[in-house]
């Protein structure tokens, strides 16, 4: 009994479909086209039975001489059909929802180069660099482009398609013309931000098979759209007899290798907005390393021509051309910077704060920025990437707070556009820094590994939006931001207000280390009297405020600024020095007292209107008490909430403690944040470790056997933690000492149920069962931040041990860059996660330093100040 597959393809009526499959009616949107069971009519007179299974229906014919197995691979009876409008034809949709739209139209070719060069917007970078850019060509057009480059004497060519969206080439007359799948909601927009792990090449192959199958079901034609402006005569049909009538990008661009041995092709998907990911920079460098002409500075052998293409030949192509021009600039190895191709069209603009910080931080930073500026100018015939930042910023500044488009804040839209353009510019500068170091070494390190050796760049990009530094009191007087009293969200769980006048006041047993919530001026007096009384006798006190948000005392109550729609969330101010925050508080205080307006304030349980008769900054609160407590020293060391202090925060805390102990070895240390909880506990642990290194580390007790669920994780034995422990000299001891310090500090705060180590697994578990995606993502971020904070404490303890011989002359931040980074610590932090508890996604942004540090820097708040 032989088995053959039926090739008949017809549309099945609903009744026929139901009679075969025994199912009810189907949705109208779904096509009923499958391999036709009406072909059974050929054998109906003899058929004895129909046997169906999950694979396909099988027809057993008369006396079992023949068997037909009808495969339903094409459709499985659920291909989706749709139409763009009621007036247009209904047809099959690729991927169940997309229409195939002609990729390039005539208006797109601004430079009018399609006829002469073969591709729209074909151009060369200025300054004599063999760097070319273009929009999407057809198959025939691409052949013309290669011929043009050959005629101009370019013997070698490396071509990069930088499109992240799928592109298919359909046979139209004698050429293959590019089409892209697009959604009905926005026919002008290509697909982007594809599912992580999905290769665009694989998606193109899938869509090709779909189009071929659809054509088989539609008499050998498929429907496409050439004119999405007027929809004249749309949709058009293209004839598809076989898969050879459809080319994928790989076929169009890779096949010339057989005719041109010195030609190379690579797919390098770049994002439409923002900077490429580190992995994309890595791929670019990896491709370039294959070309010896780029690595060797051989005057007799010119480097290959670099050709880049996206859809329009503008945004992504411009970015790629700039990357290519930087490569060729370093290949020349000549002048410190390329000569500008033409005089500047406008006066120099003020640099953004993040770029100025880069210049101040990096040796030859000024030169690196100027080189990038010159390269951008070389590639600016179609689009000036640097100018685009200022244009977006100008639009941002001209938009009112309440202006909305389609329910979304237009101001937020232009803020994101500005920040994405600025990020792209910043990463070009970082890439040039990388080339300065790595080009002479033959790219010994990939870009992603090199970035892990320069964590300061990640710290910089995390505070790209420094608009909070420019806010004024108008925000409060107009009600855009409101003042919220600290007590509203900082409960006194340790019940110390009655005795100490401040919430959550506590001491580390047998150590002069204290923690507390934010005190008012009056409460501060009570605490200072307690610390200097006859029992405690602290003659010198170092008080450190850890708050990174604006804090003001008005009418003897402590307030912070918050968004009316998010009263429970503090707004961090991204400062590089504590003085910036104190200056901002002074400005806001002056604005409030000057206004003499009734202000909307939120107290513990109610909302009131108040006019401030008095207003003090945190600095002024402490200055008031220096006359009565002459041994008091006050420091503002802002550290981020929920996460590890930054490297420089450890520097400042250690330096403050060293200075205090140099003057008096019995100094008392007091730390406060808003509630006296997270940041305060972190600083208290840092202080405990520091004092132990000054006075001697106590002996560790026998390790207790913990018989509770998740005991291993409660003890902090996560895979990623143990990876760091294995890197560190005597790493297990480093971790145990930190655990001992954490347990020592947590003994003082049992009612808070807050333990810096144990909270990691608790938060992770909460995140797995969050009520919605937003909550799950936030808890996911928190669990990773708590994990990172724990690792940083272990690293800091290791630093205290290893640098003790030199009295910690080298700051922790420098040690992290010069020692820990080289050992691979930041590479571990760049892949943070819980592999023992879940299947990790390598590309999850929060696992990466770039995504995680940006998320903790207050990103997501409405922009209230000016980008500077």
UniProtKB/Swiss-Prot annotation:
Pfam families: PTPlike_phytase (PF14566)
A GO term from the CC aspect: nucleus
Molecular function per GO: protein tyrosine phosphatase activity
Lipid attachment points (N-myristoyl glycine): 2
InterPro entries: Prot-tyrosine_phosphatase-like, PTP
Entry keyword set: Cytoplasm, Lipoprotein, Myristate
Protein's name in the database: Paladin
Organism encoding this protein: Gallus gallus (Chicken)
Gene this chain is encoded by: PALD1
